């Protein structure tokens, strides 16, 4: 959405079911004039139940066995990959082998060109991730977006305990030869790491209405 607002050619890649929710989603994209690469498949359209705790932090109940778990790698998607300069993908969409295989084929099909961006925006939700999926994604991306809680989990899984957050970020940046690592820390601000350089931005104090999607918009 944000990329299209800047006038760039962008696509939303996913899958929806042959149901009313799928129709509604396609209608919203059409209304907002957003380009899509969304397949209609014989699985129900995905839904998420979101509840907020006392501090406004969202908790998610994500339904399984849904359309976006089964995104096919079509000839049209292959053509898109061959002409893509930047892509953003996450870990949640890889919880099912079908969509994981499609995401990996898309990334591997993209031509290696200067300035190319493969952005991995980790979304550690429930138990929908494995060390193998995360390692493969680290190896395929060149930009990593992560929050402080996810960084602690990743450090525990990969054996980086007992060091501060910045040290963990430098380790990931070097180990996977990343162009950039973006760390968000909620009310404690955010960091951007590039080889040899780190910048910090404080979080502005604003009334919190709903934090759902705040990390994605960042």
Question: For the regions a protein language model found, what residue spans apply to each?
Answer:
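Conserved N-terminal subdomain of the carbohydrate kinase-like
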Residues: 8-91, 108, 112-114
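Conserved phosphate-binding/catalytic region of the ribokinase-like
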Residues: 158, 162-218
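Conserved beta-alpha-beta core of the PfkB/ribokinase-like small-molecule kinase fold
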Residues: 86, 90-167, 171
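Acidic, amphipathic alpha-helical patches
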Residues: 76-77, 134, 169, 208
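Structural alpha-helical scaffold elements that stabilize or flank donor/cofactor-binding regions
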Residues: 79-80, 136-137, 174
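Gly/Ala-rich phosphate-binding loop of Rossmann-like dinucleotide-binding domains
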Residues: 4-5
């Amino acid at each position: 959405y944000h990329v299209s607002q800047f006038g760039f050619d962008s696509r939303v890649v996913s899958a929806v079911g042959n149901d009313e929710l799928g129709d509604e989603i396609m209608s919203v994209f059409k209304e907002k004039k957003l380009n899509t690469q969304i397949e209609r498949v014989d699985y129900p359209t995905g839904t998420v139940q979101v509840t907020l705790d006392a501090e406004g932090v969202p908790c998610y109940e994500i339904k399984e066995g849904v359309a976006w778990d089964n995104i096919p790698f079509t000839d049209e998607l292959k053509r898109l990959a061959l002409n893509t300069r930047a892509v953003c993908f996450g870990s949640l969409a890889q919880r099912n082998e079908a969509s994981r295989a499609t995401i990996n084929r898309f990334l591997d099909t993209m031509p290696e060109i200067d300035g190319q961006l493969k952005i991995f925006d980790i979304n550690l939700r429930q138990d929908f991730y494995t060390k193998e999926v995360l390692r493969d994604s680290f190896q395929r991306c060149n930009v990593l977006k992560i929050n402080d809680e996810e960084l602690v989990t990743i450090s525990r899984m990969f054996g980086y305990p007992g060091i501060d957050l910045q040290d963990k970020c430098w380790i990931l940046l070097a180990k996977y030869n990343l162009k950039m690592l973006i760390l968000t820390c909620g009310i404690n601000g955010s960091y951007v790491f590039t080889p040899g350089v780190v910048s910090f931005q404080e979080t502005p104090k604003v009334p919190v209405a709903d934090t759902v999607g705040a990390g994605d918009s960042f």
